[in-house]
Amino acid sequence: MSQFTELRKIINQKGLLNKQPAYYTYKILLNLGFLATGLILLMVIDNIWLQSVNAVFMGFVFTQIGFMGHDSGHRQIFHGARKNDMIGLIVGNLLIGISYGWWYDYHNAHHGNPNQPDLDPDIKIAPLAFYEEQARGKRGLTRFIVKYQGYFYFPLILFEGLSKRVSSIRYLLMKQSRYRMVESVLLLAHYSIYLGLLFSLLGGWQALVFIAINQAIFGLYMGSVFAPNHKGMPILESDHKLDYLHMQVITARNITAHPITDFIYGGLNYQIEHHLFPSLPRNKLREAQEVIKSFCQKHSISYHETSVLQSYREILGHFHEISAFIHD
């Protein structure tokens, strides 16, 4: 019996992979409540400064809704793929304007090949460099950005939401998505409602201010949540011989658990547990951590967990270390 088979047996015996309909019903209603609050504030407040605060709040709400799309893509919510896909299409395409099909393909490629050059799309993000060879291959403006990427990282992720929207549109134009027509209609509906409401309720320049703040916060929040997961962790050689268990554990970083952290990070602070068992419901990750952390210690498998602040220090330190190859 392989180590992962042994671990999966323990996780199954504890019922941690069982679906959690009550929990996800609560999360869906909570997020819809957040969204409704933001929309009501948009309709009743006639003050650009207060609407700027609302734009920040809505950036937070969009990311929280995005976590639901992430969970549905991993089949955490329902047993059947179709039901999960329907949730993903609604929260992804309709509510936040990001293609569920694009995200599903992109994210599954990452899960199957974490921190592997040419295979993991998360380490092929222009204009950053995640390993030495990648840094040395940069030219022109991207080389300049990589040279100072430790300083540019957080300003760059302000555009993370915009980047995902552009990728979504390109995906639907160029690829035969399973739900291509449905996705296209829902995406068009999102932008029609989003832009229509803002420009009709706020007017020209105020709507543009709201959009700029809203999308920047959406990108910053989302990028900050995803950053600690793997950035600065070991990059694997293309011919590595690691089994599934070791590959997923040593390339991931956990952030120390706390109810507030769990909420803010949408459960992604349990990145090791999530990568080992992607379909494990979000509210069972903390319980799974107790099992998996103990299992890794027993079998001398490196298990990296740190604080929120230290995780960002490690990430920026890694970016500075990679950029040193250009400074040299």
Predicted regions and their residues:
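Transmembrane alpha-helix/helix-exit interface in multi-pass inner-membrane proteins
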Residues: 158, 222-239
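Membrane-proximal N-terminal segments immediately preceding the first transmembrane helix
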Residues: 2-15
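Membrane-proximal, cysteine-centered motifs at transmembrane boundaries in secretory-pathway
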Residues: 17-18, 280
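Membrane-embedded catalytic scaffold of the fatty acid hydroxylase/desaturase
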Residues: 57-176, 241-326
